């Protein structure tokens, strides 16, 4: 089968690499460097199994800047382009996605078009009605950013927002990306599938907020947070997954789903979800105070290869520290490619903040501030 994938991010690449063992896959997107890298076999995907996977499997995959060329002869179209959030942070902006759907619908009449990234609840049904596109489906992805290929090749479950033969066909194609069978497949309505995506992300956001608050209590009252978490997670109903505290949630999809649900169901009486974002704000404020208690002259923000958005926790902490008069430096380079710059950064800072502790920081562990309890 010839499959066109609109998108060049980790979701698109995870799908493409998994499907390209059995299908002809063409990716498209407006990023020349990524297109060139993909065509050179240098896939911009940070997945630990990537090198071994490429060595073991023959893949039929290429990329192009020309969307028309990518869609030519396509028997299935996947759209894996993440949505931007509105300037006021209230909800998703769908205009760009709508134009991509319309373009694919015009170029590939009758061909199944599958939306993979999070969309507003009710969006797929609205687009189906507007375009008369009965073959437009929603099939949410649940890939981890650093393990997208691994999750594609070993899915625990697949959800497709169509309960008919078309939904079963799309599920079979997505299942073909797996290296082994066994994934549970659920066919459901489009809006229900959209809701599953957002509620699952909201649960993860609430879980992150819970363990961050546990850590905040421990910080404030002199408790050993790791010991408390280890004890709490012995209960099998809680489990040992996703329990490592962090500085906070940024503008990524987890808190966005929570905000979207708050907006969509704002008139429904609720207490848990509306407080998740507020919990994140409180977490940032506490961490800023704890850092300032150490009275460092120069504070470093260690964010290798990172591009912090306006709502990223490292950015928010940096802003909070600067507002209190602290001198803040940031390292966003490639630690392995520029060791001299990293060494200079370490030497210049009295305290270094890091979301996660990496080997690059082991030599200055005494002056690293992190809430990574499982490093």
Q: Each PLM stretch: what is its role?
A:
Residues 1-375:
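Structural/interface elements that position substrates and couple domains in central-metabolism enzymes
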